[in-house]
A protein has these predicted regions:
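Short, mixed charged/polar active-site loops
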Residues: 8, 135-139, 550
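Aromatic, loop-rich ligand-recognition surfaces of beta-strand-rich domains
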Residues: 462-605
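Beta1/beta-strand and adjacent pyrophosphate-binding region of the FAD-binding site
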Residues: 7-19
């Protein structure tokens, strides 16, 4: 008998699953020096946001102003807005792909499904996946494993404690807990994308599609094209009453029948404003909401998210509403969103490191829709914006733990302040905490040619809770750090306004302060999406030389990121930033529109 080829790899951190949580975990770990393997069972990255599923990215900022996720999340969203004005999903896939490939420390294993794991005691030694495209077994040894698979593939392979289903009220004392626990979950959906044309488009449904011939059968299901142009038909949801892992193929078949039946109803049964609409996409890979949830040292509950609890080991945050999809999904009847159990949250809540590592497997971490949370708390942490910041937190923590030769649990006890400072330095927002400022940047060294620059060193890099926390500076007016003696400057860090609420982004006809606009198919009479006009596009960094002259040490007129962090190598007694223009401008110099640049942080080290 022959054997298939096998390749052995040894890294510091192995990430299983390449959704946004896994992708960002891998990138974060690699950027902080860890050698990383990213094992993804699909041909593309992005998970539910990828071209295979096409769910929009929601998060805290989708429900509460000024809470849009930053860090790597905002980095890729801005890249997509800049390079993908028509919101083409293939380009979105490529942006995530290039973010991973840009990191030399990452070995990317696409089309590779994790199948086996080897353990020694309560630690994972290696995992092995099968790569379908190469018919090769890929074995990966690592110090730390981060399961971002969504379905928690490692849970059964390594006997990690996990939960499935809905808890009884008596378990956590939650308002939305059940009288008795069950194994039901939130369901999964197939997305539909369509666009409006300037002519009538016919549609012939497949024979196997369900038939919804009357409006009564579609009662309370929003399906009027012209009125619901933003919908992606997330409500075509089934599987919550089945096994959300092992029954996925059967659920997919049912979802296809429903999805094609819904489109047939809109096109051919009644007046729904759909005559000129053309079908672009119906997914074949269901977007899952819930399956297994790991048990960590701490299990988040409804009380935690509802009260906006902040934890001493907080490493991420959420703010999406409690959004519990009841198991019946599409099959349920009821007025409006009768299949949903919702409760708006007033404040963001913290996510502790203790909810991102396993209670009983020492070197197992996780991030995404499988963290240590009750079913009700999970209904808010599960959205992709929140998954993304959890992924960045887990990857950063893993790299730091490897650096110190400790477990994630030990890191949380001994190095949590260092981890939090690194995350905030990487532009991750942690409610209730302030970022540590460079010792070179003090009120005594900072001055501005115009206005008060003190907000640049207050340690909070966004508008929040009624405070602007930013400096409004005139273009072509400098912000300067002056030192008593010649000082070596190795880098600068700049955080500019990227319009987190998307209020000044052209092509956003509904002025949505959410990231749904990333993934909306454009109709024939809609312009392309634009870019945040308030963002600083052009600026210059100058240092004072020994002759008392200002010399340019960095300059760009193509910035399209909120965080700019670049290396310098200069010895000087003064260094200054000169904002030159925002995206309101048509030229390098800000000739019209905004005469001011809105900056949250400018520091040197």
């Amino acid at each position: 008998m022959g054997e298939l080829k096998k390749i052995d790899r040894k890294v510091n951190v192995c990430v299983i699953g390449g959704g946004l949580a896994g992708t960002f975990a891998a990138v974060a770990a690699a950027r902080h020096g860890a050698r990383v393997a990213l094992m993804q069972d699909r041909p593309v990255l992005g998970g539910n946001s990828s071209s295979e599923i096409r769910m929009w990215v929601s998060g805290a900022g989708s429900r509460v102003r000024n809470l849009q996720e930053t860090g790597i999340m905002e980095e890729v969203l801005l890249e997509n807005m800049y390079r993908n004005p028509t919101r083409n999903f293939s380009i979105w896939d490529s942006i995530l792909y290039e973010k991973v490939h840009a990191e030399k420390n990452i070995e990317l294993l696409l089309n590779c499904a994790c199948c086996f794991a080897d353990c020694e005691g309560n630690k994972i030694k290696s995992v092995t996946g099968f790569q379908l495209t190469t018919y090769t077994w890929q074995k990966v040894e690592a110090d730390i494993f981060i399961d971002c698979s969504g379905d928690s593939i490692l849970a059964e392979l390594v006997d990690a404690e996990y939960m499935v289903g809905r808890e009884a009220k008596s378990t956590f004392g939650e308002e939305f807990g059940l009288p008795e626990a069950d194994k039901k979950t939130m369901g999964m959906s197939l997305m539909i994308q369509a666009h409006e044309t300037d002519h009538k488009v016919d549609f012939i449904a497949p024979d196997w599609a369900y038939k919804f011939t009357t409006d009564e059968e579609m009662k309370f299901k929003p399906h009027e094209c012209l009125d619901k142009i933003n919908t992606n038909f997330y409500w075509i949801e089934l599987g919550g009453e089945a096994d959300s892992i092992h029954d996925t193929e059967e659920v997919r078949d049912e979802l296809l029948k429903v999805a094609y039946g819904v489109w047939d109803h809109m096109k051919n049964h009644g007046e729904h404003g759909a005559d000129n609409w053309e079908l672009d996409f119906i997914g074949f890979l269901p977007g899952k909401r819930e399956s297994r949830r790991y048990v960590g040292d701490y299990i988040m509950t409804q009380q935690d998210v509802e009260t906006g609890r902040q934890f001493p080991d907080e490493v991420a945050y959420g703010g999406w509403q409690i959004d519990n999809h009841l198991p019946g999904g599409f099959a349920m009847s009821g007025k409006g969103e009768g299949h949903l159990q919702k409760k708006r949250l007033r404040e963001p809540y913290g996510i502790p490191l203790r909810s991102l590592y396993s209670k009983n497997v020492e070197n197992l971490m996780f991030a995404g829709r499988n963290i240590s949370a009750s079913h009700i708390a999970f209904s808010t942490v599960r959205v992709m914006g929140t998954c993304g910041v959890m992924g960045q937190a887990a990857g950063t923590a893993a790299a730091l733990a490897v650096h110190y030769g400790m477990s994630a649990r030990q890191l949380g006890k001994e190095k949590i302040t260092e981890l939090q400072n690194i995350l905030m330095e990487d532009d991750c927002f942690l409610p209730g905490l302030r970022r540590k400022i460079s010792p070179l940047c003090t009120a005594d060294t900072l001055s501005a040619e115009w206005g008060d620059p003190s907000a640049l060193i207050n340690g909070i890099d966004r508008k929040i809770w009624g405070n602007d926390n930013g400096y409004w500076g005139m273009v072509d007016r400098h912000i300067t750090y002056t030192f008593k003696e010649k000082t070596h400057i190795s880098d600068f860090r700049l955080i500019v306004d990227s319009d987190l609420d998307r209020e000044y982004t052209e092509g956003n006809p509904d002025v949505l302060n959410i990231s749904n606009t990333l993934f909306r198919k454009l109709s024939y009479n809609y312009t392309t999406f634009g870019f945040p006009k308030c963002m600083l596009k052009s600026f210059r960094i100058e240092a004072l030389d020994d002759n008392g002259e200002w010399k340019t040490v960095y300059e760009t007129d193509k910035n399209h990121q909120r965080m700019i962090r670049e290396k310098l190598d200069v010895d000087t007694t003064a260094i200054r930033l000169i904002p030159l223009g925002t995206y309101f401008s048509e030229s390098l110099w800000n000739t019209y529109g905004s005469a001011q640049a809105h900056i949250f942080s400018f520091e040197v080290r």
